[in-house]
């Protein structure tokens, strides 16, 4: 931010406020018709002064708007930190979600994702690179299908594989779905399962179970409580990051969260 411009903007706002205060004091000392006449005169004079100042310094309108936006962003950031703290246990220790990377890492990255989300796919390789290069990040995946029926089917399939075959098989399926751009039809899912030596029938049965849908619904409920409406959304340490983040930016967040 340009602090000289900010100072000028705040000075303008201060002067305007001072004018209003002085005029209020002056009019308060008069009574009856004289006061009403003074108020009309003072109001007209004030309006003229403000108009003249703005015409001479039109940039202050944009600068003031920028200050408001910055304050709103700072307030949103504070709210996001509070949300992460409030729902920390659900984010970190729900007892179901896949935990990878370095499970004993000194910092945790949680990703809410949808297999049909283009930006999730874009982030996929960069998240994998981050985990590999850093080596000390605990990674949690929250299945968060929000882009229609195909998204739900893909998440059901991945969760069912995890429930039956464990975390390693889940990660293989997850990686495949993140790079798959077609429709998750039954034929496609059979092919994916058999590629990894998995029997499709039990997986399809598990997909329809209440356990799988409960997990998806609980992730959605958590997202709603945390005001998450899009994917990808990351919780990196105590930082809530809404939307795609490039690799270099994620590395910077890791440094900030570690205090280095």
Question: Where do the protein language model's features map onto the residues?
Answer:
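Cysteine-centric redox/oxidoreductase cores and disulfide-bonded domains
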Residues: 145-231, 235-260
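Extracytoplasmic thiol/disulfide redox context detector
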Residues: 3-149, 205-208, 213-230, 259-260
């Amino acid at each position: 931010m340009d602090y000289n411009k900010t100072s000028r903007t705040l000075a303008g706002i201060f002067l305007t406020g001072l004018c209003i205060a002085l005029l209020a004091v002056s009019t308060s000392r008069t009574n009856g018709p004289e006061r009403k006449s003074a108020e009309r005169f003072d109001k007209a004079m004030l309006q003229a002064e403000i108009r003249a100042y703005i015409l001479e310094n039109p940039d202050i309108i944009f600068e003031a708007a920028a200050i408001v936006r910055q304050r709103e962003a700072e307030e949103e950031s504070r709210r996001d930190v509070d949300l992460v703290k409030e729902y920390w246990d659900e984010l970190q220790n729900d007892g179901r979600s896949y935990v990878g990377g370095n499970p004993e890492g000194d910092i945790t990255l949680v990703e809410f994702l949808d297999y049909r989300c283009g930006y999730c796919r874009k982030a996929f390789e960069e998240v994998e690179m981050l985990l590999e290069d850093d080596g000390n990040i605990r990674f949690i995946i929250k299945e968060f299908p929000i882009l229609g029926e195909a998204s739900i089917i893909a998440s059901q399939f991945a969760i069912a594989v995890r429930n039956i075959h464990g975390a390693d098989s889940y990660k293989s399926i997850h990686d495949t779905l993140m790079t798959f751009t077609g429709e998750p039809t039954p034929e496609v899912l059979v092919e994916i399962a058999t590629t990894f030596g998995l029997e499709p029938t039990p997986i399809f049965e598990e997909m329809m179970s209440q356990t799988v849908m409960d997990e998806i619904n609980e992730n959605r409920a958590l997202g709603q409580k945390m005001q998450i409406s899009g994917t990808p959304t990351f919780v990196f340490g105590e930082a809530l990051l809404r939307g795609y983040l490039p690799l270099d930016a994620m590395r910077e967040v890791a440094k900030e969260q570690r205090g280095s």
